[in-house]
Amino acid sequence: DAGYARKVIGPLVETIHIATLGTAATVVVAFPVAFLAARNTTFNSFTWFIGRFILVASRSVNTVVWGLLFVAVFGPGPMAGIWAITFRSVGFLGKLVAEAIEEIDAGVVEAIEATGASRLQVLWIGILPQVLPVIYGTTVYRWDINIRESSVLGFVGAGGIGIVLYAAINQFRWQEVTVILIAVFGVVILSEFISAAVRRRIT
């Protein structure tokens, strides 16, 4: 049904927005947490523990459960979905970036510190350039995952195509379910191609 297919476009675009904004917010949150969780950049053992705790807590809770929690906080809608994606993704992105920070060339950092550079300058000149490829690659890969995860967040009221899919299933409108699933499948395949192409360029 071409008419119904057009109605699916709006929720599908909302799903992409949820995944994209959630991933963008993840980068903002995960980057400082990764520096706390990396042994060679954290301030002390307490801040290292806090950083690691945040990363583990984020990964321990499923995206749908985060969705339920944020629907309770913000009410049904895409805002809950964005925060659910963000809180789930912080652990994934932060862990990989923290590991990359721990594996940087310490000689570069020591050389910059020897010039009397501030901590912020060491971070900006000595550490960030070494981990940027990991940040770019991991962010794009996580965005690809988030496209899929945001497709089901509507089942708990957190916005996107999942709300429409849930309603169609509940009312046994199987033709509409088929149209939605085909649309979701197409977006997932497209995001996979985009993710793979970007990661190839980075590496």
Name each model feature, range by range.
Residues 1-22:
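Periplasmic/extracellular loop-to-transmembrane helix junction in inner-membrane transport proteins
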Residues 28-33, 65, 80-83, 87-109, ...:
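Membrane-embedded alpha-helices of multi-pass transport/permease systems
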Residues 33-67, 96-99:
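Cytoplasmic-entry segments and transmembrane alpha-helices of multi-pass inner-membrane transporters
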Residues 55-86:
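Generic hydrophobic transmembrane alpha-helix motif, especially the helices
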Residues 72, 147-184, 203:
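Glycine-rich helix-loop "coupling/hinge" segments at transmembrane-helix boundaries
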Residues 104-121, 125-131, 158:
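Short helix-to-coil transition segments within interhelical loops
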Residues 119-153, 175-187, 191, 195:
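Transmembrane alpha-helices
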